[in-house]
């Protein structure tokens, strides 16, 4: 092949993979976008030493534009508007608004970004464009300023706001779920390592406005394969499922100083995780579909939950209080500690624990308002109860017993230390066939 032939091939390859219409079309095909493309050099001036200067508004005309690799967008008075912008390691230099109704895709290098960088976020799922500027390979700070932001599930199982590794997200505003009829969706999903979601903002689900009747998995915040993560200070309410769901082998999780109200299924579910702390939270008005507990520690089949601490948690007007259950398939619950909590239940047991290796219950106020047991423990290998104050209207004051179930063999409770728990009724070695 002569030099001209080689040169032709090189030029063709550059054209295919660069940000021209053909390259953009290939990019779109890879992620299933149906949108016309525009070449970046037709809407932007040529980069000057890797910098694209935006002095006047750039209208993408509702088309998709791929930026060249590694450029910096320097905003000096103008914004980019109306379309889809695909970054490729793109940096931003700006002290004001940058985008106006622009969908953000691709990869970016923006260590600090905010809703203030977007001129208009008055459209559903606009926050997905804000968090799309984050790069999981570098530390990110994302500020969601005061204001109302709507999110909308587009299909069953949709994630409205995905948060990835190395992100600090400060929520000051209110996120509202648009009513839908889906069985499951996730307003925010934390997936990755080293994530903080904090602030004094609010997340509101569609419990009272949901248009369907099936399902129970409309989650406010979900942890999925999340490690070294925390959620603090937030208000989360009216979720079709759980306000918070900790799942899929997450670890080193902190949920602190949050106010959870009117979860339909649970306040918090912990279904697959290790090293979880829930501290200083207030959980109220949980009810609508079973199990209806403030906190439910209940691993799915073949999953493990271990080393959970519930501390200084206040529960009021919930159908059930705290539930610990390790009886699903080959599920296992390791150690659960409950300390300095104020727990009240309007119907079910205030504290119910079944098939747990170690349960430590110390210095709690436990109240039962409807005739069920204050505390019911079954098949706990190591149980410690100290300095708890229990109150009840009628029925069993405290019920601690063996529970023998053929599927799990003869696991018997071993009472190690129960003291200062007031009037206590203990029934040992009682068998029950199910």
Segments and roles (model prediction):
Residues 6-14:
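Sec-dependent N-terminal signal peptides
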Residues 116, 171-174, 193-204, 227-238, ...:
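Right-handed parallel beta-helix
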Residues 62-63, 82-86, 139, 153-154, ...:
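Short glycine/acidic-rich loop motifs that flank beta-strands on beta-rich extracellular proteins
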Residues 53, 59, 66, 74, ...:
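Extracellular beta-strand solenoid repeats
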Residues 26-55, 116-145, 150:
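Acidic Gly/Asp/Thr-rich repetitive segments characteristic of extracellular carbohydrate-active
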Residues 13-25:
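Bacterial Sec-dependent signal peptides at the C-terminal "C-region" and cleavage site
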Residues 1-5:
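Positively charged n-region of N-terminal signal peptides that target proteins for export
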Residues 59-71, 81-96, 128-137, 150-170, ...:
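Extracellular beta-strand-rich solenoid/capping regions of secreted or surface-exposed proteins
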């Amino acid at each position: 092949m002569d030099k001209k032939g080689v040169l032709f091939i090189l030029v063709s390859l550059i054209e295919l993979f660069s940000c021209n219409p053909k390259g953009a079309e290939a990019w779109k095909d890879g992620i299933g976008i149906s949108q016309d493309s525009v070449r970046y050099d037709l809407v932007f001036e040529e980069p000057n030493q890797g910098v694209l200067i935006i002095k006047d508004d750039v209208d993408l005309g509702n088309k998709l534009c791929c930026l060249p690799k590694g450029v910096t967008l320097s905003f000096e008075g103008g914004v980019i508007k109306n379309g889809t912008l695909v970054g490729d390691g793109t940096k931003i230099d700006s002290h004001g608004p940058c985008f106006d109704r622009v969908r953000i895709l691709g990869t970016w290098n923006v260590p600090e970004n905010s809703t203030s960088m977007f001129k208009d976020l008055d459209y559903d799922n606009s926050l997905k464009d804000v968090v799309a500027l984050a790069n999981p390979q570098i530390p990110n700070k994302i500020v969601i300023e005061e204001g109302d932001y709507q999110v909308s599930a587009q299909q069953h199982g949709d994630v409205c706001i995905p948060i990835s590794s190395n992100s600090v997200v400060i929520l000051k505003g209110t996120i509202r779920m648009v009513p839908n009829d889906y069985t499951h969706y996730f307003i925010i999903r934390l997936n990755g390592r080293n994530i903080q979601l904090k602030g004094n903002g609010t997340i509101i689900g569609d419990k009272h406005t949901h248009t369907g009747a099936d399902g129970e998995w409309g989650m406010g915040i979900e942890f999925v394969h999340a490690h070294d993560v925390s959620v603090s200070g937030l208000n989360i309410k009216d979720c079709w499922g759980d306000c918070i769901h900790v799942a899929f082998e997450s670890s080193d999780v902190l949920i602190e100083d949050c106010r959870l109200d009117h979860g339909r299924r649970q306040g918090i579910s912990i279904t697959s995780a290790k090293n979880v702390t829930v501290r200083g939270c207030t959980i109220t008005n949980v009810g609508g579909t079973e199990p209806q507990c403030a906190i439910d520690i209940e691993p799915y089949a073949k999953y493990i939950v271990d080393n959970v601490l519930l501390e200084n948690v206040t529960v009021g007007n919930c159908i059930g209080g705290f539930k610990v259950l390790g009886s699903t398939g080959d599920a296992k619950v390791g150690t659960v500690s409950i300390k300095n909590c104020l727990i009240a239940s309007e119907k079910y047991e205030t504290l119910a624990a079944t098939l747990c290796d170690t349960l430590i219950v110390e210095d709690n106020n436990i109240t039962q308002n409807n005739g069920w047991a204050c505390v019911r423990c079954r098949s706990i290998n190591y149980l410690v109860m100290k300095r708890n104050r229990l109150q009840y209207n009628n029925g069993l004051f405290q019920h601690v017993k063996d529970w023998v179930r053929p599927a799990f063999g003869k696991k018997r409770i071993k009472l190690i230390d129960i003291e200062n728990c007031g009037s206590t009724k203990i029934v040992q070695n009682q068998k029950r066939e199910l």
